UniProtKB/Swiss-Prot annotation:
<dbReference type="GO" id="GO:0005737">
    <property type="term" value="C:cytoplasm"/>
</dbReference>
<dbReference type="InterPro" id="IPR009022">
    <property type="entry name" value="EFG_III"/>
</dbReference>
<dbReference type="InterPro" id="IPR000640">
    <property type="entry name" value="EFG_V-like"/>
</dbReference>
<dbReference type="InterPro" id="IPR004161">
    <property type="entry name" value="EFTu-like_2"/>
</dbReference>
<dbReference type="InterPro" id="IPR041095">
    <property type="entry name" value="EFG_II"/>
</dbReference>
<dbReference type="GO" id="GO:0003924">
    <property type="term" value="F:GTPase activity"/>
</dbReference>
<dbReference type="InterPro" id="IPR035649">
    <property type="entry name" value="EFG_V"/>
</dbReference>
<comment type="similarity">
    <text>Belongs to the TRAFAC class translation factor GTPase superfamily. Classic translation factor GTPase family. EF-G/EF-2 subfamily.</text>
</comment>
<dbReference type="Pfam" id="PF03764">
    <property type="entry name" value="EFG_IV"/>
</dbReference>
<dbReference type="InterPro" id="IPR009000">
    <property type="entry name" value="Transl_B-barrel_sf"/>
</dbReference>
<keyword id="KW-0648">Protein biosynthesis</keyword>
<keyword id="KW-0251">Elongation factor</keyword>
<feature type="domain" description="tr-type G">
    <location>
        <begin position="8"/>
        <end position="282"/>
    </location>
</feature>
<feature type="binding site">
    <location>
        <begin position="17"/>
        <end position="24"/>
    </location>
    <ligand>
        <name>GTP</name>
    </ligand>
</feature>
<feature type="binding site">
    <location>
        <begin position="135"/>
        <end position="138"/>
    </location>
    <ligand>
        <name>GTP</name>
    </ligand>
</feature>
<dbReference type="InterPro" id="IPR014721">
    <property type="entry name" value="Ribsml_uS5_D2-typ_fold_subgr"/>
</dbReference>
<dbReference type="InterPro" id="IPR031157">
    <property type="entry name" value="G_TR_CS"/>
</dbReference>
Length: 692
């Protein structure tokens, strides 16, 4: 089967936003207009095609990013709908890694919400060109220009309007296209019928002003245009479009458009903008990677003629076909039934079938090409972030970084029958989600699950019951504390067993120093000279220290931000072994850490509360009582905003408290920001409780 669409006519985009900005509705409308769905699914009534897990339909939020293919104006648009809830940032991170461009959806009333900032920062990190779509223009309090200001001030972006709304709130009836200088007015409810008219008389001046701003912004990225513009020559529509595209791809501007997806207004022009201004796979720089054999840097150009290279960005368990691995092809082509190498794990995999996904139904395709996004059936060892490539042409593509979980709960099966099923189910779920971890507590034998927040773990427990029929009791959420040291020390570790039979001998001196937070977390330096510790025993010492760091000395929490330098030691010709040096390394670390002024660290969350003016005092008082540090207070619309840093330990059950304090009118969002030392009196309580 040959390619349906040339690579230049492919768009891989993500739709990203804060919860409730209307992201899933927007995707639904795109699918409707591109002829993929015959009846529009509303999120309100739990029928949206992109939200296909039961939990999503009940909660009205998107949890997993579904990938869908649509067609518009002779282009193929692959869309990934990403979740906007902070507990699921990993899904967003994953999607952005494999996209070429994105549409950021903002609510015209709320503007830039905290989650929009997080997602925007993630997109900045990957240098993703994006369009901003200001949605919900029909809502009371809709303000397009305030949305533009917030994109500029809160996100530090350079927003440039390429459309203006005609009216707002219930008078929102169309848009003015600043490129063509025409007005598009919608006639029917489905928005498929619209007419192009002249600009309304009361908007002529405003349109001129914003068109000038647009021309100025795009002329800056093109010298020839700049000359034409300065000499007062009229620029053609085509020239303006090319210039907008160029500036958008260079991430110099963010074109801003508007609409109301729910009322079906503005979605077709959003599709036009995706095709006109967002990159094709051929517009983005070649993907970087490393050759695993030589360690040298390598790259793949987006072309069918290059060797095959793809990145698996999501694993899902499907009730019908088993394990599905979603992947993005960066170069080359792949036929179903062929073999590829998982270069990250060094294992050969057979691709059984290749499926093209449409939110929750699928079609089987014989072959994928560069730039495609599809799902493979039959990959046994592949997990999120792995590279799949041609066996003759090895490369490992740059993977993704995932944050450590910050909250954990003990979970136990209700019956013996549930016990066996629970193990299998949890391992499948942790395969799907790299921020969800499962471990067994050595002291109590309990199974501990850890994740990014209360909602994250709630949904996991819910899925256990629905998908895997496992009934489980869940303990109270616990905070993932960590430990570190505050001063540098030198310490000795000596492990000697020499009474009869083969002896053991390992002896080391190490220096421990605190590292800055936010860095690598652990660093090992070998300063052995003259072979006092033979080379083959260096790595075991490192491993011994790493193992000892897993169980901190204050309360058994993981230790972080430590640099260990091995600088002296001794060995025995006969009795020394890797095991002996591993134990010596671990002993030296424990001895040193005791003396290095160890402290307990706790996760601090950035909390943003939005409340009506009259509850402001209560909310601030409450945050202070939770050991919160108020950072700033501001206004958004007619509500007040309080930003604070609060320890996670004090935030359990906050949703209920806030509801009762503000009679249900306050909302909040929180996300993990950093770790900080626990105040001494509180740390003593935590340590005593752990040692019980």
């Amino acid at each position: 089967m040959a390619r349906q669409f040339p690579l230049e006519r492919t768009r891989n985009i993500g739709i990203m936003a804060h919860i409730d900005a209307g992201k899933t509705t927007t995707t639904e409308r795109i699918l409707f207009y591109t002829g993929r769905v015959h009846k529009i699914g509303e999120v309100h009534d739990g029928a949206a095609t992109m939200d296909w897990m039961v939990q999503e339909q009940e909660r009205g939020i998107t949890i997993t990013s579904a990938a869908t293919t649509a067609q518009w104006n002779g282009h193929r648009v692959n869309i990934i709908d990403t979740p906007g809830h902070v507990d699921f940032t990993v899904e967003v991170e994953r999607s952005l890694r494999v996209l070429d461009g994105a549409v950021a959806v903002f609510c015209s009333v709320g503007g830039v919400e905290p989650q929009s900032e997080t997602v925007w920062r993630q997109a900045d990190k990957y240098g993703v060109p994006r369009l901003a779509y200001i949605n919900k223009m029909d809502r009371v309090g809709a303000d397009f220009f305030n949305g533009m200001d917030m994109i500029k001030n809160r996100l530090g972006a350079n927003p440039v309007a390429i459309q203006l709304p005609i009216g707002s709130e219930d008078r929102f009836k169309g848009i003015v296209d600043l490129v063509t200088k025409k007005a598009i007015v919608y006639i029917d409810d489905l928005g498929t019928n619209s007419e192009t008219t002249d600009i309304p008389a009361d908007m002529v001046d405003q349109v001129e002003e914003y068109r000038e701003k647009l021309l100025e912004a795009v002329a800056e990225s093109d010298e020839e245009l700049m000359m034409k513009y300065l000499e007062g020559e009229e620029l053609t529509e085509e020239e303006i479009k090319v210039a907008i595209r160029k500036a958008t791809l260079a991430v110099k501007i963010t074109p801003v458009i508007c609409g109301s997806s729910f009322k079906n207004k503005g979605v077709q022009s959003l599709l036009d903008a995706i095709v006109d201004y967002l990159p094709a796979p051929t517009d983005v720089p070649p993907i970087q990677g490393v050759n695993p054999d030589t360690g040298t840097e390598d790259q793949r150009i987006s072309s069918d003629n290059e060797p095959f290279a793809a990145l698996a960005f999501k694993i899902m368990t499907d009730p019908y076909v088993g394990k599905l691995s979603y992947f993005r092809v960066y170069s080359g082509t792949l036929k179903s039934g062929s073999y590829v190498l998982n270069s990250t794990k060094g294992k050969k995999e057979r691709v059984g079938r290749i499926l093209q996904m449409h939110a929750n139904h699928r079609e089987e395709i014989p072959e994928v090409y560069a730039g495609d996004i599809a799902a493979a059936v039959g990959l046994k060892d592949t997990t999120t972030g792995d590279t799949l490539c041609d066996e003759k042409s090895l490369i490992i593509l740059e993977s993704m970084e995932f944050p450590d979980p910050v909250i954990h709960v003990a979970i136990e099966p209700k019956t013996k029958a549930d016990q066996d099923k629970m193990g299998v189910a949890l391992s499948k779920l942790s395969e799907e989600d790299p921020t969800f971890k499962v471990r067994t507590d050595e002291e109590t034998g309990q199974t501990i699950i850890a994740g990014m927040g209360e909602l994250h773990l709630e949904i996991i427990v819910d899925r256990l019951l629905r998908e895997f029929k496992v009934q489980a009791n869940v303990g109270r959420p616990q905070v993932a504390y960590k430990e570190t040291i505050r001063k540098a020390v030198k310490a000795e570790g000596k492990f000697v067993r020499q009474s009869g039979g083969k002896g053991q001998y390992g002896h080391v001196w190490i220096e421990l120093e605190p590292l800055e937070a936010g860095g690598p977390g652990y660093e090992f330096v070998n300063k052995i000279v003259g072979g006092v510790v033979p080379r083959e025993y260096i790595a075991p010492v490192d491993n011994g220290i790493k193992e000892a760091m897993e169980n901190g000395i204050l309360a058994g929490y993981q230790m972080v931000d430590i640099k260990a330098t091995l600088y002296d030691g001794s060995y025995h010709e006969v009795d020394s072994s890797e095991m002996a040096f591993k134990i010596a390394g671990s002993m030296a670390f424990k001895n040193g850490a005791q003396k290095a002024n160890p402290v307990l660290l706790e996760p601090i969350f950035k909390v943003e509360v939005t409340v009506p003016e009259e509850y402001m005092g209560d909310v601030i008082g409450d945050l202070n009582s939770r050991r919160g540090r108020i950072e700033e207070m501001g206004q958004r619309g007619n509500a007040r905003i309080v930003s604070a840093f609060v320890p996670l330990a004090e935030m359990f059950g906050y949703a209920t408290d806030l509801r009762s304090k503000t009679q249900g009118r306050g909302t909040y969002s929180m996300q993990h920001d950093h770790y900080e030392e626990v105040p001494k009196n509180i740390a003593e309580g935590i340590i005593a409780k752990r040692k019980g």
